[in-house]
Amino acid sequence: MSQASPLPRYAVIGNPVAHSRSPQIHAMFSSQTGKPLQYERLLAPVDGFAATVQAFREQGGLGLNVTVPFKEEACQLAGAHLSERARLAGAVNTLWLRDGAWHGCNTDGVGLVSDLLRLGVVLEGARVLLVGAGGAARGVLQPLAAAGCARIHIVNRSAQRAHDLAAGWAAAGAVPGTRVTAGALAEAGVAGGWNVVVNATASSLQGAAPELPRGLYAPDALAYDMMYAAHPTAFMRQATDDGAARTADGLGMLVGQAAESFLIWHGVRPDPSPVLTALRATLLAKD
């Protein structure tokens, strides 16, 4: 680990972490806002998250972005100092020191909502299909509900996991104006179609799409994949074939959640748009 730096020190911690675009994103935010910082990657052993965080703190570290597989451990580390979003998600992707203690928030869902709004989606009263019932899905439920979605239907290959997520959400203190239901992948349809379909699975990393029935999309609906790539993902291609008016990948969500973390740490909200444009160009150039 590097020596203490005179600059405010931040990092992304995970395993693996070499692929992370967070250093590039936060460097651009730093230049944009005039907030100087040092931002690095921290590779933690799978069984060494707490020790790596402690060493980072002892060397002057002030804040961390947390990626797989440590988001649940980060939630435990922050203990009683969790935001409402983090409490409902059961996971933390942003840590910062305040009054000698680690505080935690989950900015993933805010990143998704901000990108959906950037794309012109009207979430107030929207019907949303959420595909997947893991941590990625759990992390976006509260922000989607808070944005005014009328219904969120969770479907998963294991229907029981979807039902468990919906039940846990209700038990944790759900947003009462949003109806949250669950079922199997085959139960993904709804009369009139969905306004937004979000793929919260990692299927696109394997070049596959979830096994969804046809006829899912309302007119002008958006299909959104949390994964991102230089070209449309398997889920995006499936959605276009099924009649989705528009598709988008998760690069904007990545930049959006990073912008929210930057705001928490530095008290200023950066503009995600030029950063997203630069990252997209980088993706295409490497293709």
UniProtKB/Swiss-Prot annotation:
Binding locations of shikimate: S20, R21, S22, T67, N93, D108, Y228
Pfam families recorded: SDH_C, Shikimate_DH, Shikimate_dh_N
Keywords in alphabetical order: Amino-acid biosynthesis, Aromatic amino acid biosynthesis, NADP, Oxidoreductase
Domain of life: Bacteria
Job description of the protein: Involved in the biosynthesis of the chorismate, which leads to the biosynthesis of aromatic amino acids. Catalyzes the reversible NADPH linked reduction of 3-dehydroshikimate (DHSA) to yield shikimate (SA).
NCBIfam families: aroE, PRK00258.1-2
Subunit structure: Homodimer.
Protein name: Shikimate dehydrogenase (NADP(+))
Gene: aroE
